[in-house]
Amino acid sequence: VYPVYVDSNIMAGREIVYATSNEANGFAALPDENVKADIIYLCSPNNPTGSAYNAEQLKAWVDYALKNDAIILYDSAYEAFITEDLPRSIFAIEGARKCAIEMCSLSKTAGFTGTRCGYTIIPKELERDGHNIYATWYRRQATKFNGVSWPVQCAAAAVFSEEGQKQIKENISYYQENARIIASALDELGIYYTGGKNSPYIWLKCPNNMGSWEFFDLLLNEANVVGTPGEGFGENGAGYFRLTSFGDRENTIEAVERIKKVLTNLSK
């Protein structure tokens, strides 16, 4: 799970229930009818696992939310990386407008990390306990937030221009090819992973039953390659590791060759 979801709710004093996300379900958690939740965080394509929900899986979450009077907070920060016939938005699912809020960011789509610009979609028909959620959110924003700076707004507007969309598609295609290169190497090595398509992330199972930090140390010391230990994303990440395609082509190819060499020697 993306750590911000956890930490922000801990600071708010909320009780947190973790959905089961593991190899058995392809790291695409599904609702548990025995669990009652008021707010549900979903991220698809997922950070860190790279898995992306299909329409049937998202429908299961929407049905659960409607049945339990819950609200889904849907993080679609990586929707631009989807290449297969998968939903890019929770609102592609019937009934979602009555139970979901969608958040998206230009951080990964257009390289806005640090510049900070994104958007939130709240259907005007979304209500809970007699309160209109859109009206409440609008009041909150008008009180606590003065908006993104003008230069950043201009840059964000350029993202949606014809030329901006052309450049973004080229940029995303570049990272998608990096992800394919990494995934191809893992296929060659026979290592289980999720992601590698529809996402810039590759979530791999550490070889030889190694722990996440043990594998981190191996790659750092033997290959001079750095990734993210899965344990940093919660207990379901133990024994897994995240690689990213957000690098240049030359470094990606070099890193893959180094990883292949280390893991080939490890299996001897």
Question: What is the meaning of each model-derived region?
Answer:
Residues 93-173, 180-184, 263:
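Conserved core segment of the aminotransferase class I/II
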Residues 123-124, 161, 205-207, 246-248:
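Residue-level recognition of strand-loop junctions within catalytic nucleotide-signaling folds
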Residues 12, 67-68, 189, 223, ...:
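Helix C-cap/helix->beta junction micro-motif
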Residues 209, 214, 218-228, 232-268:
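PLP-dependent enzyme catalytic core of the Aspartate aminotransferase-like
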Residues 1-14:
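Substrate-binding/gating loop at the entrance of the active-site cleft, primarily
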Residues 153, 157, 172-183, 193-206, ...:
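Conserved glycine-rich beta-strand-loop-beta hairpin in the small C-terminal domain of fold type I
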Residues 14-91:
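Active-site phosphate-binding strand-loop segment of PLP-dependent enzymes
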